[in-house]
Amino acid sequence: MAVTSSSSSQPPAASQPGHFKRLWAYLRPELSSFILAMVAMGVVAATEGIIPKVVKDLLDQGFGGEYAGKLWRVPAMLVGIAVVRGVAQFGATYFLSLVSNKVLLNLRMKMFERLLQAPAAFYQRNTAASLINAVIFEVNQVLQVLTGVFITLVRDSMTVLALLIFLFYTNWRLTLVVAVILPVIGFLMSRINRRLRSLNREHQNLTNEAAYVVEEAAGGYKVVKLHGGEAYESRRFNAMTNRLRGYAMRMAVAGGLNQPVTQFLAALALSVILAIAMVQAQANQTTVGGFTGFVMAMLLLISPLKHLTDVNQPMQRGLTAAEFIFGLIDTPIEPQDGGKHIDRARGDLRFEHVTFRYGPDGRAALDSIDLHVKAGEIVALVGPSGSGKTTLVNLLPRFFEPTSGRIVLDGDALADLSLQDLRRQIAFVSQDVVLFNDTIAANVAYGARDASEIDMARVRRALEAAYLTDVVDNLPDGVDTNIGDNGSKLSGGQRQRLAIARAVYKDAPILILDEATSALDSESERQVQAALEALMQGRTTLVIAHRLSTIENADRIVVLEHGQIVEAGTHRELLDRDGLYAGLHRIQFATQ
């Protein structure tokens, strides 16, 4: 995958024609606007070739004979050319911007949709900063290719073509000298090209790493401040930005060679042309107007040639960004597998010989798990850190797929069920609360397509079950109050209870609780524990517990160690066995 925080991970090197071909697929629906932009740029280019022709005719014929009486046409033609050129330039910019912004929208939506469809392993491989960078920054790099760079390529290429036609028409011998120079320029540019693309790719990876450093420092600001980590974070970011500066300077050196090399070759060509023109003038093979028009066209040719050579560096940045973009778009989506639909499951779960490894060579996080959870049963999962509790519950909504074995819901393997239907059967409350920068009602009813689909009476009941009504009623806008980034306007306990209210609103037959009362004070914990116990009634519930006092009333407690089930039974049965659970219980209550 292209988007990664590791500088060692690079996107697959695809060919430039491959990138352009894929971009063309996004351009094709806007073909009419694209053609209008091309026509407008062609008009702009054509006006460049007319000006030297007017000057040539003026010098050769304008100071005598019949043409002298028509000199008023010259300023009129110049004004007319300026008007036509201005209108065409506006049209080209407008229509191409129209196309590029629609392409930008489609690319961003495609990338974001692919992010939403990516498997959980994708989010473990990539940092949030690198994904944000890809969707926001990298697409803008491609936008530069589609606007400024493309305008330069098309308009200035047409201008060069128009001027070359005039040059051949005026003096083909002198034009051949120019034609000799162009392949030399092209060869030099191709050599610089390869260097620029390599540097751009490394620069892109380092940019992702720098963004990740900022994300960590900003997200963990409390730890940074309490532990005096400001100097460490500053040194870390300084080291990263210095590496970025080094690559930026190498890119500047490689890109900076374009202009002086082009200008030197242009000056050399002009010197040779002047020498040949003087010889032709002595042999009456050229006129004053012809030579002046030729030199003028040559001078007009330098500017678009310069633009064409300068466009190389941003174009390479855009093509490198395209590698990242298409790398993300090509990310495999979650396997959908079977299409069997279920309305509401009973909640009977079976884990049959389930083994799971993180990576092909990793240690087994789960090893031959056999577990039957009856419909409506409350099963607590306990064990030391790293024993496999979280991994086990992550397999249920198919965030990950078992390495071997299978999980069965109501007699059907999870792989045979519609993934969307399966996840509708599961509500999840974690100690790591995730809330959205939206209203309280929208967070409780998360998943509703729009505000009109939210059942406000149901939201109210969910808030009551989570003991949040008093808090919400005291807010200025009630359930329509915006809670800020990840609920930043709420206290830790209020955030946890809002997550519980979301699970209550969903009313799923299967409930997963991962230390759901960990962030609550004693009073709130008693209230929410009572609400959770009511919520768990009639639902299949898996509870991950670190505080054993919260799961004493579970129907069954399953103890895991090193990815295996080592004990199972009720709280009293496990204490009587005096095994691992009893040991954990003694340690925990001794510290209390």
From Swiss-Prot:
Signal peptide residue numbers: none
Membrane topology: Multi-pass membrane protein
Function: Involved in lipopolysaccharide (LPS) biosynthesis. Translocates lipid A-core from the inner to the outer leaflet of the inner membrane. Transmembrane domains (TMD) form a pore in the inner membrane and the ATP-binding domain (NBD) is responsible for energy generation.
Keyword Membrane: yes
Gene Ontology CC annotations of this record: plasma membrane
Protein name according to UniProt: ATP-dependent lipid A-core flippase
CDD domains linked: ABC_6TM_MsbA_like (cd18552), ABCC_MsbA (cd03251)
Subcellular localization: Cell inner membrane
Catalytic activity: ATP + H2O + lipid A-core oligosaccharideSide 1 = ADP + phosphate + lipid A-core oligosaccharideSide 2
EC number: 7.5.2.6
Start and end residues of each ABC transporter domain: 349-587
UniProt keyword terms in alphabetical order: ATP-binding, Cell inner membrane, Cell membrane, Lipid transport, Membrane, Nucleotide-binding, Translocase, Transmembrane, Transmembrane helix, Transport
Domain ABC transmembrane type-1: 35-317
Domain notes: In MsbA the ATP-binding domain (NBD) and the transmembrane domain (TMD) are fused.
PANTHER family linked: ATP-BINDING CASSETTE SUB-FAMILY B MEMBER 10, MITOCHONDRIAL, ATP-DEPENDENT PERMEASE MDL1, MITOCHONDRIAL
Keyword Transmembrane helix: yes
Pfam families noted in UniProt: ABC_membrane, ABC_tran
Bilayer-spanning residue ranges: 31-51, 76-96, 134-154, 161-181, 261-281, 288-308
Chain positions recorded as ATP binding sites: 383-390
Subunit record text: Homodimer.
InterPro entries with a match to the protein in the record: AAA+_ATPase (IPR003593), ABC1_TM_dom (IPR011527), ABC1_TM_sf (IPR036640), ABC_transporter-like_ATP-bd (IPR003439), ABC_transporter-like_CS (IPR017871), ABC_transpr_lipidA (IPR011917), P-loop_NTPase (IPR027417), Type_1_exporter (IPR039421)
A molecular function (GO) term: ATPase-coupled lipid transmembrane transporter activity
Gene transcribed to yield this protein: msbA
Family, similarity comment: Belongs to the ABC transporter superfamily. Lipid exporter (TC 3.A.1.106) family.
